[in-house]
């Protein structure tokens, strides 16, 4: 074990667990991590992140496990920080304050119980609040940056900061936290009071749309490719017009319900999924001259 990693583990005083990451991703694909860390509260998370900065340790923050593809051909040799226990949610009038690991279903339920509108667009997704902020989650014409108020995070110097953010600080699927050694801890959302029945109807409508698109039939990472306004069409439509629905490699297939979903239909490997993503990109480029950009993150690949 490298000296820096050994020092890191001594500083955090949390015993790493051995976990199969396939059990923590929506693709149901992954390999063993022997450095799986589960902070039980924000204080423990702060200690982990600050120790990682001090020792220059690469980490991966794992939330709901969507939008990622973990290499299943090799053991993951860097610490995985699982945020599943960082899930506290508080209500303050029309504001929700959630820890980074708060899942969408719990957030939406609490919002509905308190007649608060603004989270309907994420209902039915498997992600967490921290991941949603990191990637500026977007669907049905709404994005998380529209309802953001404050974010508490650790910067690359190990300082805990609470800062207000505006929608203009974010772009399509881009946040100020990407490509930076920052760690999101808590998020404050600014919601609006509305009729409870109307909120519930919107939530159910959005979930039904996901059911109709086959989102829950097979394991997947969610949308595979970002949309690009310059293409004048959603990526899923472009893939469908290239007649790529049903295209398969190994156990991976382009969903027959939605062109932008690559699904694990029959014990797919990470190589199957990655190869199919590359095949779809190549075919679309060959037929249209358009270069699709992945939304999925590759973890543990060289």
Curated annotation (Swiss-Prot):
Domain FAD-binding PCMH-type, residue spans: 28-194
GO MF assignments: FAD binding; UDP-N-acetylmuramate dehydrogenase activity
Keyword flag Cell division: yes
Gene Ontology biological process: cell division; cell wall organization; peptidoglycan biosynthetic process; regulation of cell shape
Residue numbers annotated as active site: 223 (proton donor), 295
Cofactors required: FAD
Catalytic function, reaction form: UDP-N-acetyl-alpha-D-muramate + NADP(+) = UDP-N-acetyl-3-O-(1-carboxyvinyl)-alpha-D-glucosamine + NADPH + H(+)
InterPro entries documented for this protein: FAD-bd_PCMH, FAD-bd_PCMH-like_sf, FAD-bd_PCMH_sub1, FAD-bd_PCMH_sub2, MurB, MurB_C, MurB_C_sf, Oxid_FAD_bind_N
Domain of life: Bacteria
Chain coiled-coil ranges: none
Documented EC number(s): 1.3.1.98
Subcellular location field: Cytoplasm
Main location as per UniProt: cytoplasm
Keyword Transcription regulation: no
Known pathway: Cell wall biogenesis; peptidoglycan biosynthesis
Keyword set, alphabetical order: Cell cycle, Cell division, Cell shape, Cell wall biogenesis/degradation, Cytoplasm, FAD, Flavoprotein, NADP, Oxidoreductase, Peptidoglycan synthesis
HAMAP family found in the cross-reference section: MurB
Function: Cell wall formation.
Record-stated family: Belongs to the MurB family.
Protein name: UDP-N-acetylenolpyruvoylglucosamine reductase
